[in-house]
């Protein structure tokens, strides 16, 4: 029987058929570079669109457009309530075009249309409206001073928050719309201008969203999009002297390179990088909760999630039960195209990434690791990798220490919780972790001792706009989200008045 597919909207096909350029100064236009980048549907491997491959001159045009918009105060100079209204209108337009954006996301990235609708658009709308509300909550403080000179003088002082300037937002390919808006919205809420560089693999939704931003009333030059390679376009953007802040989400290796570049100009930087995230399952945990929670926490978006649980440490009394449960769950997953409403595992984003993930599994198989695999997906089509459990892998295997970023999960037997903690923290990463237990005292103790920026108890990979998120160790620097989110996009100015 032919697997059902969601019908592609006519406006989506029309957008795919365009000759895409860049989005600079409030309008789409051609790049100076004549090079093009092909965009492929991961489910078929077929080209579906192309975009400009921007060069250094194109990036300079975008940054200078953002700079002119910033210094003219055409956005930062507006009343906070007016900026808030425009950003809420922007969110409303994204909601009105939600199915269009969800389909574009699935066609270029490969993920399930259900995930595109619920996460890429649904969660993005929550973040957009939350962040729009912060626009009118930016506040400084009044301060009492103890300056003794000249004798008898009195002082009044306060601080104020001012937008940092032009922001460079570097967006990964795993959640292009959602993570893109995590950079756009705080920048705009704070009064900054921004230049977004989406991944060259998945640039389409950011180009479309930029058009909606202009329609909402965001002034020309405030929101710009350049598409191109990291080596040329990304490097030119992060090294530009008029960029005041860089917000990057991606690999640790690339993040380190950006940090070195930023140091040359003392550019402010927020880095959300890789993770090799542990889950500790204690012997009193509810097996059903564990299997349901960690199947999502591990295999959401084919494991292409920085926060995914890729190492599961299970106390011995529960190990066999959970291995059996996970095996049954993995083998029941339906594998197919993202535009299929019934497929639960979809293709990886690109041929190159598919080959990389397969290399980890080939290495494990060569070392005679025990692999439990689900369905391989459609034969001869797309970039599919079967969801895979690796049981008690040798510590020397690459997949025990390196971020695989695919549908591959290690199940490891441990004698007790202390061994699990030692193994969980024995990594260069520190993005997320979880502990599974019905004992409140153990939950609190383990959440304290796990070395990760976010620790969940009896859940994994659940985030919220009001909860700060970021990494320890080599998983990054800085925090996104939460009521103080905009502090990272503002300068703090001190004002002192003698009277």
UniProtKB/Swiss-Prot annotation:
One Gene Ontology cellular component annotation held by this UniProt entry: protein-containing complex
Catalytic residues (positions): 272, 306
GO biological process, one term: NAD biosynthetic process
Keyword vocabulary terms for this entry: NAD, Oxidoreductase
EC id: 1.2.1.39
Pathway(s) where this gene product acts: Amino-acid degradation; L-phenylalanine degradation; phenylacetate from L-phenylalanine: step 3/3
Residues that hold NAD(+) according to the record: 250-255
GO molecular function, one term: 4-hydroxyphenylacetaldehyde dehydrogenase (NAD+) activity
Subunit annotation: Homodimer.
PANTHER family the record matches: ALDEHYDE DEHYDROGENASE-RELATED
Name listed for the protein in its UniProt record: Phenylacetaldehyde dehydrogenase
Origin species: Escherichia coli (strain K12)
Lineage of the species this protein comes from: Bacteria, Pseudomonadati, Pseudomonadota, Gammaproteobacteria, Enterobacterales
Gene: feaB
